[in-house]
């Protein structure tokens, strides 16, 4: 996978709205939707958002989320965590992943 490089937070916010917001929230105390709330995800292990029902695959992967691991995951979620229930095909363009992860790193703090 490509090394993560800081991208455009503004473009990342737009990508989040069009590709992620239907299933995820980012704000502290935000609700779980089809997917978990992402607040505080960086530095946390996969499958650990309190109150969200994960697949065994997400729990067993036990990856610690960082800009790099998130970028790798978003390239092809089902390949990175076989058995994940995330029904998103991934972001194939490295630039899109960099922009989205740059946005997420700030929006989920």
UniProtKB/Swiss-Prot annotation:
In-chain residues carrying the UniProt-annotated modification N6-methyllysine: 61
Signal peptide: none
GO CC terms in record: mitochondrial intermembrane space
Sequence positions bearing N6,N6-dimethyllysine: 61
Binding site for heme c: 20, 23-24, 86
Residues with N6,N6,N6-trimethyllysine modification: 78-79
Pfam families referenced in this protein's UniProt entry, alphabetically: Cytochrom_C
GO MF term (any one): electron transfer activity
Assigned protein family: Belongs to the cytochrome c family.
Function field: Electron carrier protein. The oxidized form of the cytochrome c heme group can accept an electron from the heme group of the cytochrome c1 subunit of cytochrome reductase. Cytochrome c then transfers this electron to the cytochrome oxidase complex, the final protein carrier in the mitochondrial electron-transport chain.
Protein name in the entry: Cytochrome c
Organism: Wickerhamomyces anomalus
């Amino acid at each position: 996978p490509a090394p993560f490089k800081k991208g455009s937070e503004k473009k990342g916010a737009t990508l989040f709205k069009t590709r992620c917001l239907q299933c995820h929230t980012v704000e502290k105390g935000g609700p779980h939707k089809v997917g978990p709330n992402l607040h505080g995800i960086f530095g946390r292990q996969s499958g650990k958002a309190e109150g969200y029902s994960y697949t065994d695959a997400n729990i067993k992967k036990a990856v610690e989320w960082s800009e790099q691991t998130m970028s790798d995951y978003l390239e092809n979620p089902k390949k990175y965590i076989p058995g994940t229930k995330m029904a998103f095909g991934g972001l194939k363009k490295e630039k899109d992943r960099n922009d989205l992860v740059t946005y997420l790193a700030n929006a989920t703090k």
